[in-house]
Structure formats: structure tokens, C-alpha cells
UniProtKB/Swiss-Prot annotation:
It is found in: Cytoplasm. Keywords: 4Fe-4S, Cytoplasm, Iron, Iron-sulfur, Metal-binding, Oxidoreductase, S-adenosyl-L-methionine. This is Pyruvate formate-lyase-activating enzyme. Activation of pyruvate formate-lyase under anaerobic conditions by generation of an organic free radical, using S-adenosylmethionine and reduced flavodoxin as cosubstrates to produce 5'-deoxy-adenosine. One of its GO terms (cellular component) is cytoplasm. InterPro entries: Aldolase_TIM (IPR013785), Organic_radical-activating (IPR034457), Organic_radical_activase (IPR012839), PFL1_activating (IPR012838), Pyruvate_for-lyase_activase (IPR034465), Radical_activat_CS (IPR001989), rSAM (IPR007197).
Length: 263
């Protein structure tokens, strides 16, 4: 266990930070993008976070990152705070525990954005994960695909651990926002959208269910890294397809929380 006095000294490999994030949790947020991710999502807009070694990544202490975040605290109001994303943030769990512990000591709202690929339902893993959850107010859980075969096509990995994490978070009552990226021809099949909606209904802790329309804003990063972009020529979903997905998955069921946040 990390001693409380050492939280500021715990280091992590950080790709970048964003001062005024507005889509990574409630309110205005300071967002930390961690380095490293095992998934290879075809639509990834941060492929520069995949490898643990990257020229942009910097080893930083939790104390240093927290001090940077505090510079923007006045903009957070009653709903904002700190979000840690990636990459996959849980690859560096000690850093997350340290940063979020510093935040909670100051009463700051904490959000974890995760794909949950690292999740393991084992005593050793859960011992540390429970410490993280103790200082995490909200989890943004990305469910890329409910269909296991399609999930492997989309990400290169099974969705078994993701669904196990979703069930665990439901069992402990941790507030969660479920997110699904809608990609034409890849993650927008009606039968799978219906199944995902049915699955989410079985979870007891979902405050919000978001459809994130696919965009091409990260395509240039693939070119910079010399990696062929697998979705070349694929356009964002039409408004009709987005409405269709929301209808099939009954996302409006979870809109009350959104209304409370915005008023």
C-alpha cells in the first residue's frame, strides 16, 4: 500500500493534459491523458498513447500534476473536477490512486475514463482496484461492442474483462456513465445496439448512457506515426443513425442525470 505521505511523489507516465475538458465527465474538468494502452481500436483518436515509450510522454509525479490541476480550480464550479483518461489509465493504477487521493483530500470530484481491459476479478487485482474506487467518484466506461466477435475486430481484444468490470461496478454501486462510439459499418449494427441496450438495463448504477458519434479528428495522428488508418473514407454517422442508436438503446432512460447537471 502506498503511504499517504508519499502520494505526491508517486510517478506516472503522462502523455498530455487538457485544462478545460467539457466532455470527460460533469462540468469543466482538468483531464490527464496517461501513456499506454493495450487496445488497438480502429477509430482511436489518440494512437500516440498506445506505446509506453513515446517522445511526447513525460514521467511526472502525482503532486506535480495535482498542482497543475489546481491552477484551474476556480473554473470547475460545483460540478467540475479532475478526469484521468488515456491511453488506458488503469495500467498505472498506483499513480491514479495517488492523484485521486490528493484530490479527495481537497474535496475535488474525480472521474476515471477507462476501457477496463486490464480488469481482473482476482483478489490481488481487486485489492488495489478497491483502493482506486474508494477515491473515484465516477467511472466513464467505454463499451466498444457487446458482440464479442465484433469487439475483437474493433479493438483486437475480447470484451470479457470489460463486461466483468461493468458488472463489478454495478455490484458495488459505483456511479457510471456508459459510452459507445458509433462508427458506420463497424459498431452501428441494429441487432448489437439492441443487445447493448438490454445489457446496460441490467446494471444498477448507470447514470448516463452516451452515444459518441465517430469523428476523424485523430486521423492525422495515425499518419504522423506512419500507421495506416483502417477507417480511411469512413464518414461520421448521419443524425438519423445517431437517433436510431439512441432509440434502440433507450438512452433517454438515463437523461434525468444530465438534466440535473445542466441546471
Amino acid at each position: 500500500m502506498i503511504e499517504k505521505v508519499d502520494y505526491e511523489k508517486v510517478t506516472g507516465l503522462v502523455n498530455s493534459t487538457e485544462s478545460f475538458g467539457s466532455v470527460d465527465g460533469p462540468g469543466i474538468r482538468f483531464v490527464v491523458f496517461m501513456q499506454g494502452c493495450q487496445m488497438r481500436c480502429q477509430y482511436c483518436h489518440n494512437p500516440d498513447t498506445w506505446a509506453m515509450k513515446n517522445d511526447r510522454a513525460t514521467e511526472r509525479t502525482a503532486g506535480d500534476v495535482f498542482k497543475e490541476a489546481l491552477r484551474f480550480k476556480d473554473f470547475w464550479g460545483d460540478t467540475g473536477g479532475i478526469t484521468v483518461s488515456g491511453g488506458e489509465a488503469t495500467l498505472q493504477m498506483d499513480f491514479l490512486i495517488a492523484l485521486f487521493s490528493l484530490a479527495k483530500e481537497k474535496g475535488i470530484h474525480t472521474t476515471l475514463d477507462t476501457c477496463a481491459l486490464t480488469f481482473r476479478n482476482t483478489p490481488k487485482y481487486l485489492e488495489k482496484y478497491e483502493k482506486l474506487m474508494a477515491v473515484t467518484d465516477l467511472v466513464l466506461l467505454d463499451i466498444k461492442e457487446i458482440n464479442p466477435d465484433q469487439h475483437k475486430i474493433v479493438t483486437g481484444h475480447s470484451n470479457k474483462t470489460i463486461l466483468a468490470c461493468a458488472r463489478y461496478l454495478s455490484d458495488i454501486g459505483k456511479p457510471v456513465w456508459i459510452r459507445h462510439v458509433l462508427v458506420p459499418g463497424l459498431t452501428d449494427r441494429d441487432e448489437d445496439l439492441i443487445k447493448l441496450g438490454e445489457y446496460v438495463k441490467t446494471l444498477k448504477n448507470v447514470q448516463r448512457f452516451e452515444i459518441l458519434p465517430y469523428h476523424t479528428m485523430g486521423e492525422f495522428k495515425w499518419r504522423e506515426l506512419g500507421i495506416p488508418y483502417p477507417l480511411e473514407g469512413v464518414k461520421p454517422p448521419t443524425p438519423d443513425r445517431v437517433r436510431n442508436a439512441k432509440k434502440l438503446m433507450h438512452t433517454e432512460t438515463y437523461e434525468e442525470y444530465k438534466k440535473r447537471i445542466n441546471h
